[in-house]
Amino acid sequence: MSTSQAEHTRVHPRRRPLKTAPPSLSASTSIESCVADSSSSSPNLSLRKGETFHSPSPPPSDDIDPVLSFRSLPQRSPTCTRSLEAIAAREQRMVDYLSNLNLNSLEPSSPLSDKDNGDDLPVPRAILQAHIDSQSMADRVGRPTQSSELHTPSKVRKTHCHASDSGLGTSLSSENMSASDKSKGIFFYLLNLQPHFLFANMLVIVKAGQLSFESQSSAKATTRMTQSAITSSISAFDAKISQKRQLGLPACKQIERLIIKPILREERLKPFHPLVQSIPQRIVDREIGCLRDLEKTLLWLAPVSDFQKRNGVGCIAHSFSRVLKNYAASRASYLRFCEFTIQCLHTSVYHLNERDQRLPADRPYTNGYFLDLVAQIRRYAAMINESRSSMPSNREPAQNGAKASAPKYVVSPPSRWFARFNIVRSEHITLEGGLSKNGRPAELVVHKDGEMISLRTGKPYEENAVPAMKRSLSLGSVDEGVERSMARRKKNAPPMDINQKCKDCDKVFKRPCDLTKHEKTHSRPWKCTEPSCKYHEIGWPTEKERDRHINDKHSKAPALYKCKFAPCTYSSKRESNCKQHMEKAHGWDYVRSKHNGRNSKKASNGATPQTPSIATPSSKAQGITTPLTGSEPSPFEPVTAYPPNPPFSFADPPTQTGSGDFPLFTTNSPFEDLAAGVNDFSPLPTTSLDFQAFQSQLEGADPNGLIPLTFDRQSFDSGSPVPDLINETMGFDTSPVASTDSSSLNFDLAWSQLDAQNVEEEFTTLTMQMLTPEHSVSMSALNSFSRDPSISNPSPLPVQKVENSLYTPDSCHVDEGVSDLFDSGYQHKADFMLFDQHTNFGASSVNMSSTCQLSALHNSNQMFPSLNTPDLNYMTQGWPQDMEMEHF
């Protein structure tokens, strides 16, 4: 083998020489040049199968450059001049592209030609997604009620919803679309707008992350599954892997009964009825998987517009609120809807289990959660109201004198439903400051007319301002009193001099209050109201002295204080003088507010006798004790009572029989009338709900608890199928109850068709109080215990009114020291029974009325045998070994 052949075999595929020159950056890339190059090229050149992965055959030796063909060197150095020029050229092209997009102005940087209005510019994803969502909602409303076969996930494909072309072909030719069709679509309006107008000055709320799935089998009947931005993530949705949980039959019935129907019955909430009518279809499409998803959909989509134009284009929320219809016309209507919805949500919490209420990672429904939700709703309503009131279309352009200034607000491009919007041109927001930049916290700043205004304070932003410190850095400026109050006093420190001297005299006071009182004797701030009086300038140290002076000297009708001892006629203008008179002349006990020691030597002559104690009605009934209140039965359990003169028997206790006692709750509830049909059921009155009282109950209750319902609600009959609540009465077709589509929920399923395990799961996870069934009802699904006493571990005894749980000492695990007190060698045979199994509990209960069964079930270890049947072995029966009867 030659040396040249060995050298060629060691050639790396990525190290092979470059046959053609690199394309020039400034060269023309027109189609004509490409065609010319292809036509002028050699026809012998062809693409071989292994050209990409294998080293080509070596070129002729005449064409090899000895420098470029040196195998140990790369083709081009990273610091090559041509590489640097290519990088600089790319950066220059990017600068040229960005210079054409001015995001802060609506004025075009260069005139647009006709070719710029074509399809070369991609449609913004937000606009395209809103258009797709509107078509999806239109298909939902217009979907036929007939059942359609649910396609398997293998036949479902993703619809191409990207704004740009993939390059692999097109589904619709532009020549096939007429000009009239283009003028009706939303793309005709969007392509007339500037790119910076679309991206910078348009506020769009869309369902981010929504994906559409379309079946290939039928062009008319399509099945769409969407993801909402409120209840789902933005990640891609896989129909096979991530199937969101669907609400079950009981949860859908409760939501329809407690949330959908009450809102649809409210005439004042009529603007929000389209949103509520879309809830059943959202549940079917798995957009709503729990009560928390329903809450977010109702509360956060309430101010969003869903108006359908005549061309079928869905409108976009928040940005066209003055042109199109919105759910919330005002802040008051939105708050009214949210308050009513929150009360319905609070009611439905008691009728749904934890799995249907929220996800495991979500915050549970408590009083604190509802209070936070109310505060968040009101703050959100205030933000929406503020944004709508401060829209550019609501404000007039600024004018300077008689001549208007430069147009601050400009009109959008000539589209009729965009023409009413004025967009602010010169306002933009930036993030200024930072601890690493100027030592101040970062904050948002609005640039408006060359002025910077802080959004945090609303004042002009000063970029070079000195950052404020919490404490002064100068030690000399700190007050001594501040140091003493902020620092803890040292141990064994000498006492501080707290004596303060008066500034006007030489008196020293230990207390600051005494010093303040003394200083008023020098300032005398209380002046007389009479200008001619000398005390008008001198004044009095206290207000009381000033009032007494005016009453004595200047009052025309002074208040006189008369002596209370008749027939004495003494009177004085001063109350203190009258009291001193009664004390000296009549021996009255003058109790002064401040004891000065003058009355301590003499005793009181006219002491007031003590009032004799008078017995109150409650003091005579102290010996009567309050009787103990027994346990009350459940309201849904029939009223029971013991029969008079029951027969005495330990083994056969008296059973309860029905009596004519009054019921605890009325049977005719205003919300329990099911005879007229479920469609007439009105769980929420329109005038009796006071949200302020509801909020007060939440604030006064435990934040981690949940206040009970204020009125009773009756559930559906568990044995009858669910009727159609919405299709005929409410008047919309997208209810899962009325839907006969196989892809929707099966609402014709009755309780009897569910598995027993599912029934127990639904009942054990409920937060509401369980209803006590009657003894005559067979509990085949919930009765998991056996009533056969022959089994070693019998079930608990029937419910009694007293505690009767008896067990042997060896039936539980005890401590090591305590176990020494019992006989370890004793082996008990069986535990004795205190009460007999007489009450019938379903099919598995034991009939204790037969004599033969009593004798068969009799245990030799039983403490008290039955007295109703003769037992020959009764006299010879021995007592149990674990009992010692000392006194019988």
Curated annotation (Swiss-Prot):
Signal peptide: none annotated. Keywords: Metal-binding, Nucleus, Repeat, Transcription, Transcription regulation, Zinc, Zinc-finger. Changing residue 518 to A: Impairs DNA-binding and leads to itraconazole hypersusceptibility. Residues 23-32, 167-176, 388-397, 602-632 have a biased composition (Polar residues). A zinc finger (C2H2-type) spans 500-522, 561-586. Residues 1-78, 132-176, 388-407, 589-663 are annotated as: Disordered. Disruption phenotype: Leads to multidrug sensitivity to azoles such as itraconazole, but also to terbinafine and simvastatin. GO terms for cellular component: nucleus. It comes from the Eukaryota. One of its GO terms (molecular function) is zinc ion binding. It is found in: Nucleus. SMART domains: ZnF_C2H2. InterPro entries: Znf_C2H2_type (IPR013087). Transcription factor that contributes to azole resistance by coregulating the expression of the drug target erg11A and the drug efflux pump mdr1. Binds to the 5'-AGGCA-3' motif in the promoters of ergosterol biosynthesis and drug pump genes to regulate their expression. Is able to interact with the promoters of sltA, sltB, erg11A, erg13A, erg24A, mdr1, abcE and mfsC. Involved in antifungal drug resistance to azoles, terbinafine, and simvastatin but not amphotericin B or caspofungin. The C2H2 DNA-binding domain and the C terminus (residues 596 to 888) are essential for the functions in itraconazole resistance. This is C2H2 zinc finger transcription factor sltA. It comes from Aspergillus fumigatus (strain CBS 144.89 / FGSC A1163 / CEA10) (Neosartorya fumigata). The lineage of its organism: Eukaryota, Fungi, Dikarya, Ascomycota, Pezizomycotina.
